[in-house]
């Protein structure tokens, strides 16, 4: 009977934790009102998710932005609610809404492509019978927070190379360390985790390329790979080298990206949560304190 009673009135620890989209012209009063409304309807935790449509007056990770984050966290604490921090401005995660690359273009996403024309700046990986296999910047982007920064728009932020330890370190310094600096007294109590969302190695809006990073050629060679055989990737064929490539790529992503975030979260008293780039990337779930992708539905509030 106790079990049935808990099903009818579950403890707060079993609450749903929805994405709470932070956009528009946010105010302290409105944040407090919406959190109180969540609690009144049995929602005792939220993911603070900055989202497209954020006021241009609110700079991502800026002073006003963090003042609003503090308001939300303090209000949640007063309501005995839990907060999960979202580690990006929109998605995919890993670029701090373009800030990782802004002053460090060398940290932008890169990949390999098969081409008949080697361009200045290309790194020749192998010459094959179907063309040159070269490494170049992918030009991949992410969805931004402000109007004019969405997919296909000229100000869409560039994505960072999440296989590059230096890029991931910069992402953590810009994002995780900034949140900790601003609201560290709530880590491990009100704040229980960081949510990373579908990190993409190439970024969005990229075609004709496969992920790569500086130093990966040597990793591949030492594992017994022949780079010339990766030309098969571009016509959908498989061979021992394409299978080795995918295996090493996932290992690298796990160690450099997910592993770094997981260790940071553990060291700061919270857990890594999130959605891998591919929902069936089971191997990387070992880095998550709360494994498993998200469930997508919508909670709509009526304006008053």
Spans of features found by a protein language model:
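Aromatic-lined carbohydrate-recognition surfaces of secreted/lumenal glycan-active proteins
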Residues: 84-89, 195-197, 257-280
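Catalytic domains of carbohydrate-active enzymes, especially glycoside hydrolases
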Residues: 33-49
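Conserved small/polar residues in nucleotide/adenosyl-binding loops
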Residues: 297-304
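N-terminal carbohydrate-binding accessory modules
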Residues: 1-13
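Aromatic- and acidic-residue-enriched segments that line the glycan-binding/catalytic groove
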Residues: 61, 93-117, 200-231, 285-293
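Acidic/aromatic-lined carbohydrate-recognition and catalytic surfaces
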Residues: 49-169, 173, 184
């Amino acid at each position: 009977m106790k079990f049935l009673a808990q099903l009818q009135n579950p403890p707060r620890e079993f609450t749903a934790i929805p994405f709470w989209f932070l956009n528009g012209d946010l105010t302290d009063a409105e944040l407090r009102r919406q959190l109180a409304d969540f609690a009144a309807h049995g929602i005792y935790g939220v993911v603070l998710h900055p989202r497209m449509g954020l006021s241009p007056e609110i700079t991502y990770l800026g002073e006003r932005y963090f003042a609003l984050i503090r308001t939300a966290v303090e209000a949640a604490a007063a309501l005995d609610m839990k907060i999960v921090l979202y580690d990006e401005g929109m998605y995919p995660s890993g670029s701090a809404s373009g800030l990782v690359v802004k002053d460090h273009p060398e940290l932008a996403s890169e990949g390999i492509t098969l081409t008949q024309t080697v361009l200045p700046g290309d790194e020749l990986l192998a010459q094959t019978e179907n063309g040159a296999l070269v490494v170049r910047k992918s030009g991949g982007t992410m969805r931004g927070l402000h109007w004019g920064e969405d997919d296909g728009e000229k100000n869409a932020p560039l994505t960072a190379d999440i296989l590059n330890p230096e890029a991931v370190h910069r992402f953590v310094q810009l994002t995780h360390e900034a949140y900790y600096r601003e609201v560290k007294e709530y880590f491990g109590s009100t704040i229980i985790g960081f949510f990373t969302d579908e990190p993409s190695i190439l970024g969005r809006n990229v075609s004709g390329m496969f992920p790569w990073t500086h130093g990966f050629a040597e990793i591949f060679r030492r594992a017994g790979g022949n780079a010339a055989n990766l030309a098969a990737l571009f016509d959908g064929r498989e061979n021992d080298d394409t299978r080795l490539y995918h295996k090493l790529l996932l290992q690298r992503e796990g160690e450099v990206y997910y592993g770094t975030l997981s260790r940071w979260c553990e060291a700061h008293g919270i857990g890594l949560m999130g959605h891998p780039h591919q929902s069936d990337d089971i191997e990387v779930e070992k880095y998550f304190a709360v494994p498993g992708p998200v469930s997508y539905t919508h909670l709509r509030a009526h304006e008053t």
